């Protein structure tokens, strides 16, 4: 089928109501940018899941980063999208005047800073899903090879698959998943096979152009209509079915899995990545960061993260919570659902 036939099919779909979840902030943005919702039947509802690593990072992690940055002769490197995430003791941005915090553009900046001043402890706020984990692993491999000992990694690195299983277990009304393209470049598509079989739901990997997303929605709908539940790869120009073997090997050498807390979901076994024994000396206090701030009842960030509501259904959306003054983490990041919805609606 060509794209016109796909649009015609989706626009005229009149089967049972369907709820399809994407778990990638770039997909969320692309769906808005290309007006995908206007091209499909109102019976096909597209919702956002836990696709933003910044948004699911717990309060305790922010506080741990702040505490490190306030240590004597210590400096914290972080990507800019972490600066406004609220912690129990304020955000990194709010603590910047009393803490040594630098916005980085690459984890490898830590090596140069550590070499420039061996007496200073350089902390790296490592937040992300499988897409960004190899960069942190390679940086630590390089530091270890060069005998650099004054780098510390504070990790909130997570893997997407356990969160998808949490959704399947706790959100029975999700009918199918638009799987993340960037993450799947690393993991491949076979990681979704077991979930598709166990829960009877389609898992289809999508690219980021309008036609990619529309084709993915079409394949999910067709699978549901024909009683199928399989994983499919519709992003073959970037995603290999078996993933990136070299990247996976690097991750496995440096990191091991353990429990991690996700905002909105709670603790999920095996979803966190922590430094293995031979790299443990580089850990900056990453384990056991489970405490999370209770947001006021009016803030429904947790419900947004798991797709229970759309961002504009939150009573604080645009009313005391916007990208300039975010209250919840979903409004902070460029990949956060609330931030994307706000920028596209205003």
Language-model-detected regions and their locations in the chain:
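Glycine-rich beta-alpha junction loops
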Residues: 24-27, 129-131, 157-161, 181-185, ...
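Flexible, glycine/charged-enriched surface loops at secondary-structure junctions
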Residues: 19-20, 150-151, 226-236, 262-263, ...
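A conserved active-site cap/scaffold subdomain adjacent to cofactor or substrate pockets
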Residues: 152, 171-237
